[in-house]
From Swiss-Prot:
Effect of E442A: Blocks IgM BCR assembly
Residue intervals on the Extracellular side: 1-450
Posttranslational modification: N-glycosylated; important for IgM secretion and its localization at the plasma membrane. The interaction with FCMR is glycan-independent.
Region of interest called CH1, as start-end residue ranges on this chain: 1-105
Name the UniProt record assigns to this protein: Immunoglobulin heavy constant mu
One Gene Ontology MF term: antigen binding
Effect recorded for G191S: In IMGT allele IGHM*03
Keyword Glycosyltransferase: no
Length: 474
């Protein structure tokens, strides 16, 4: 073929947003060039060099060559949002080319800031103290700063700010929430000091004031949450319950909660009112039972709330998420480590549940055919599988005395998940199976990446100082 200069194309990922990973990869494809002599370089928008590049060998296709280059950028830099693109430059004997490669866009959402104040009788101790609670919700990206002011001056002591957490949601961009509390003296509060929760996010400042002379802000507007039935509740109670939670009610006597089907038909709804909360509000829950088949069909159900404080009814609609792949869990039962048994104190049995989808799973322990009390074991929340996108794993840890284990008592881990043939499977372990792993026949090799790291960390977090060793029978 005749000599020709390359044509350039940007390569960008359509996967997760940069807030989910530590680095962001973008690439550049050079195509249809001859001869096979090409040099890639990368620059930021301001023309400074990017060093973290990776080239791939050129490929001959249809008489001409193609090659790619990749650059890895720290996601915290991309999150700054100062560069919309980076520049891919190519040198070739038949002409130099350059192409702008766009960087992923972060969903930038401001926080909603609310301050919850103590009720009049909420002060205790000597001197009498209580807490102000500040909550920032619905923001992205996760970098945020929360501080407290009293009469405009920063407060240094009595502040506790939790870690930023991702909010649970089915779809849409990942958003975050954070809670901060300030311990206050009753004398300062009744002396009408003005306290301020200040939230700094992406160069913007959000402030919410609180004082004993302020009337409750309209920010404590009534909120409605429609909660779908969990698989665990369906499995345990054999009923499919829709739950509608209403919060921040100033009075409870005029609230009504009703569930309706997609066709408008009412579903019998039972309502419960809470006791008064620390911020002097009430909450209410409206529950309705439906057929599991109706829920599984994808039918939409709507919760409608009326109250004298609302100018018009509030509505929330839910349905079972569509298109979620079903993957049955693999269940592995790991006996106590020998080092732990040698201490003659307790025995820890671990039930590892891996590779399942959707994330809803139920784990229960049994001894001699009887369910054990939930206080005896700890089950983790389902977490995404590191190596298998869209699948989850969880683990449950049962602690018994070393004497019980050594008597040869058998323990059974029961796992229920909607993808299992009969919705339930179980694994049993006792002293005679020590050194073995009770598991499905397939894929124990794939277990190590997940098991060794997470179980050890989980045990350490529960203050076990012994090393956990997992034995595999060849």
């Amino acid at each position: 073929g005749s000599a020709s200069a390359p044509t350039l194309f940007p390569l960008v990922s359509c996967e997760n947003s940069p807030s989910d990973t530590s680095s962001v990869a973008v690439g550049c494809l050079a195509q249809d060039f001859l001869p096979d002599s090409i040099t890639f370089s990368w620059k930021y928008k301001n023309n400074s060099d990017i060093s973290s590049t990776r080239g791939f060998p050129s490929v001959l296709r249809g008489g001409k060559y193609a090659a790619t280059s990749q650059v890895l950028l720290p996601s915290k830099d991309v999150m700054q949002g100062t560069d919309e693109h980076v520049v891919c430059k190519v040198q070739h004997p038949n002409g130099n080319k350059e192409k702008n490669v766009p960087l992923p866009v972060i969903a930038e959402l401001p926080p909603k800031v609310s301050v919850f104040v103590p009720p009049r009788d909420g002060f205790f101790g000597n001197p009498r103290k209580s807490k102000l609670i500040c909550q920032a919700t619905g923001f992205s990206p996760r970098q945020i700063q929360v501080s407290w002011l009293r009469e405009g001056k920063q407060v240094g002591s009595g502040v506790t700010t939790d870690q930023v957490q991702a909010e649970a949601k089915e779809s849409g961009p990942t958003t975050y929430k954070v809670t901060s509390t300030l311990t206050i003296k009753e004398s300062d509060w009744l002396g009408q000091s003005m306290f301020t929760c200040r939230v700094d996010h992406r160069g913007l400042t959000f402030q919410q004031n609180a004082s004993s002379m302020c009337v409750p802000d309209q920010d404590t507007a009534i909120r409605v949450f429609a909660i779908p039935p969990s698989f665990a509740s369906i499995f345990l109670t054999k009923s499919t319950k829709l739950t509608c939670l209403v919060t921040d009610l100033t009075t409870y006597d005029s609230v009504t909660i009703s569930w309706t089907r997609q066709n408008g038909e009412a579903v019998k709804t039972h309502t419960n009112i809470s006791e008064s909360h620390p911020n002097a509000t009430f909450s209410a829950v409206g529950e309705a039972s439906i057929c599991e088949d109706d829920w599984n069909s994808g039918e939409r159900f709507t919760c409608t709330v009326t109250h004298t404080d609302l100018p018009s009814p509030l509505k929330q609609t839910i349905s079972r998420p569509k298109g979620v792949a079903l993957h049955r869990p693999d269940v592995y039962l790991l006996p106590p480590a020998r080092e732990q048994l040698n201490l003659r104190e307790s025995a820890t049995i671990t039930c590892l549940v891996t590779g399942f989808s959707p994330a809803d799973v139920f784990v229960q322990w049994m001894q001699r055919g009887q369910p054990l009390s939930p206080e005896k074991y700890v089950t983790s929340a389902p977490m995404p599988e590191p190596q298998a996108p869209g699948r989850y794993f969880a683990h449950s840890i049962l602690t018994v005395s070393e004497e019980e284990w050594n008597t040869g008592e058998t323990y059974t881990c029961v796992v229920a998940h909607e993808a299992l043939p009969n919705r339930v499977t179980e694994r049993t372990v006792d002293k005679s199976t020590e050194g073995e792993v009770s598991a499905d026949e397939e894929g124990f090799e794939n277990l190590w990446a997940t098991a060794s790291t997470f179980i050890v960390l989980f045990l350490l977090s529960l203050f076990y100082s012994t090393t956990v060793t997992l034995f595999k029978v060849k």
